[in-house]
Amino acid sequence: MNQQWTQYIQIIKQVVKPALGCTEPIAAAYAAAVARKELGTSDIDAIEVRVSDNLFKNSMGVFVPGTGKIGLKIAASVGALAGDPTAELEVLARINEQDVAAAQQLIDEERVTVARMDTQEFIYCSVTLTSGDDVVSVTISGGHTNIIQIMRNGDVIFDAPPQQRVATASVCEGVDISIKQIYEFATQAPFEEIKFILQAAELNTLLAQEGIDRGYGLEIGRTLKGNIEQGLLGNDLMSRIQMMTSAASDARMGGATLPAMSNFGSGNQGIAATMPVVVAAEVFQNDEEQLARALIMSHLGAIYIKSYYPPLSAFCGNTVTSAAASMALVYLAGGTFEQSCYAIQNVISDSSGMVCDGAKSSCAMKVCTSSTTAVRSYLMAMGNHSVKNQGIVGEEVEQTIRNVGSMVRFGMPYTDKSIIDIMSA
C-alpha cells in the first residue's frame, strides 16, 4: 500500500476513536484523572477547573455518563476520584454509584470550582487538584486528550513540544488529500487494511439500539419509531436513518454508559458519519466490504472537510459530516464519483446555516436534520441534480469546501461570542 494511503489510515485512527460521553466534559474528567494519578491520592481537598469559552459552551447542558448529572463540576470531580487515566475518552467507563456520590459531596461542600479562561485555543482545559500541601495541575489544549503540561507543586514535570501544543491545526496539514483522493482510497485500498472502521458500525449501532430501548433526552428516536409503527411514517430509508441516528444521539447526550465511535472529537459527528451508512447498507443489501469502504469514505471525508476550520466553532459540524455521509450513500447505491460530489454540494447548500449552541439533548435533532439532508441530497445526486455557483456553493466541490472554511474562520467568531454570551446570561 502506498505511503499516501498509509497517511490516510493514520489520520482516521488518530481522530476516529471510541468516546464515552460528550467529549468536552470528558476532557475535564480525563485531565482530573491524570492529575490524581500524579498526585498519588484520592484524598482531594479542592478541584479547580479552567476552560475555554467553547469547551464551556459544550459542557453546559450535557449529561456526564454514569452520573445522571450535567456539567463540568461532576465530570471533573468524578474523574478525579475514580476516572481511569489510561482510558482517555473512556475515562469514566468504570465509575459506580459510590464514586458519583463521593464526587457530588465534593461539589456540595463547594470544593469544586469552574471558571472560563481567555485563550485563543478552542479546546482548552486545565484541572488543578489540591491535597494538603500538594498541588498538581494538568493542562489539555488543542485536542480533548492532548496533554501539553503537567505541574506538581510549581515544578513542570511534563511539557509537550511546540508541535504538539497546537493540535487544532489541521490533521491534514502537509498531507496530499482531496475528495477525489479520498474516494479512490476508500474504493481501492485493500479491505484488510481498512476493515478496522467496521468497529464504528458496531459501537454506534449498539448506541442507537440503546436509544431505542430506553428513554434518553428528547427521545427523538423512540418517537419516530412509535410513529413508524402507527403508520404515520413509512418504514423506509429516510425514516429508518432518522430514527437510528437520532436514537444514538439521544443515548449519547442523555448519559448512556456506552461509547460512541467519535469523529474529530465529536460523538454526534461520529454517529452522523456512521449510522446513515449502516442503515443504507442494510436497505441496499451491501456486503461487509462495501460497508467498510463507505464508512472510510464518510469518516475521512468528514475529517477532511472539517480540517478547513477550527473545532468547537459556531458552525455545527454535523452539516459537513452529513455531506461526507451523503457521498458514501451514493457509493453504496452504485453511483459515480461525480454524483458523490453532487451529494456533498447539495448538503452544504441545504444545511450550512446550522449553528452550534452547545452540547445538549437537542443535538439529536440536529443530527437527525443533517442526516435527513444527506438522504435527500443523495437522491438528488443520483438523478444528476446538483447545486453549483449558488451562495457559498462553488463551481466544484473543493471550492465549496474552501468556502465553508472561510465562512467559519472569518465570518463566525462574533456569532460564536454572541451564542456564548446568551448561554451564559
From Swiss-Prot:
InterPro entries: Ser_deHydtase-like_asu, UPF0597. GO terms for molecular function: L-cysteine desulfhydrase activity. Pfam families: SDH_alpha. GO terms for biological process: L-cysteine catabolic process to pyruvate. Signal peptide: none annotated. Belongs to the UPF0597 family. This is UPF0597 protein VP2173. It comes from Vibrio parahaemolyticus serotype O3:K6 (strain RIMD 2210633). The lineage of its organism: Bacteria, Pseudomonadati, Pseudomonadota, Gammaproteobacteria, Vibrionales.
